[in-house]
Amino acid sequence: MAHSVKIYDTCIGCTQCVRACPTDVLEMIPWDGCKASQIASAPRTEDCVGCKRCESACPTDFLSVRVYLGSETTRSMGLAY
């Protein structure tokens, strides 16, 4: 099972998700599309354990973790977006 962390353009650059991640999957990168000029990125998705702590920490509720089951259909991990 692979996890893919999706960061949408409503990220406010607060870094709470980065600090909440127990496996250090997330990092902040420069991004002109938000107020803080930085956005969360997930370059190490293979290390994601799907705990969703990043989602819980996100004050804007626009961070989502989705589970991809190989060639099967994508299923949401209880997210609303």
Curated annotation (Swiss-Prot):
Keywords: 4Fe-4S, Chloroplast, Electron transport, Iron, Iron-sulfur, Membrane, Metal-binding, Oxidoreductase, Photosynthesis, Photosystem I, Plastid, Repeat, Thylakoid, Transport. It is found in: Plastid, Chloroplast thylakoid membrane. It holds the Pfam family Fer4_21. It is a peripheral membrane protein. One of its GO terms (biological process) is photosynthetic electron transport in photosystem I. [4Fe-4S] cluster 1 binds at C11, C14, C17, C58. It comes from the Eukaryota. PROSITE patterns: 4FE4S_FER_1, 4FE4S_FER_2. Its EC number is 1.97.1.12. Residues 2-31, 39-68 form the 4Fe-4S ferredoxin-type domain. One of its GO terms (molecular function) is 4 iron, 4 sulfur cluster binding. It catalyses: reduced [plastocyanin] + hnu + oxidized [2Fe-2S]-[ferredoxin] = oxidized [plastocyanin] + reduced [2Fe-2S]-[ferredoxin]. The keyword Electron transport applies. InterPro entries: 4Fe4S_Fe-S-bd, 4Fe4S_Fe_S_CS, PSI_iron-sulfur_center, PSI_PsaC. Apoprotein for the two 4Fe-4S centers FA and FB of photosystem I (PSI); essential for photochemical activity. FB is the terminal electron acceptor of PSI, donating electrons to ferredoxin. The C-terminus interacts with PsaA/B/D and helps assemble the protein into the PSI complex. Required for binding of PsaD and PsaE to PSI. PSI is a plastocyanin-ferredoxin oxidoreductase, converting photonic excitation into a charge separation, which transfers an electron from the donor P700 chlorophyll pair to the spectroscopically characterized acceptors A0, A1, FX, FA and FB in turn. HAMAP family: PSI_PsaC. This is Photosystem I iron-sulfur center.
